[in-house]
Amino acid sequence: MKSINILAAVVFGTLSTLSATAEQVGEVGVDWVGNDIIIDAIRDPKVEGVTCHVAYFDRSLIDRLSNGNWFEDPSNASIACRQTGPIKVGDIDLSEDGEQVFRESRSIILKSLRIKRIFDEANQTLIYIAHAQELTEGSAKMSISTVPLYNATLAD
């Protein structure tokens, strides 16, 4: 039992250090019931000098009460990633599947907003894709942004 607890602590600690954190930088009210568009800044933890801004819809309590869906926010998100300083690429996943940079729950257990980074080696470009992942069904809602690696420092 002790080894399982140690393994769980190591896995949780590793996962929590790999995922970026979001910092809210904007909030736009869209109606009288309190629904908002939230804008977060997310720095890529393995690529210094790249920041992604993600906008998503945050439902108000009144909207949740009137629609009867208490525990879920919409999956829609928009992403824009830019160079915000000298780019220094760390040890990133180079596979076609890419690497998760950020994850945030959009419901109690079934849905999350995720940002993945994929490296396009032929074009020396980082591709960031924001998408919803649902336990019960897939979602076609996605948004991408690219950051070209002009004069970037790559990990050895």
Predicted regions and their residues:
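Bacterial N-terminal signal peptides that target proteins for export
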Residues: 1-8
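Bacterial N-terminal signal peptides
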Residues: 8-16
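Sec/Tat signal peptide C-region and signal peptidase I cleavage site
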Residues: 17-22
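Extracellular/luminal recognition modules and glycoprotein regions
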Residues: 23-45
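Residue-level detector of short, conserved catalytic/binding motifs and their immediate flanks
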Residues: 37, 50, 79, 126
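Mature extracytoplasmic domains of secretory-pathway proteins
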Residues: 51-120
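C-terminal partner/receptor-binding element of secreted or periplasmic proteins
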Residues: 122-156
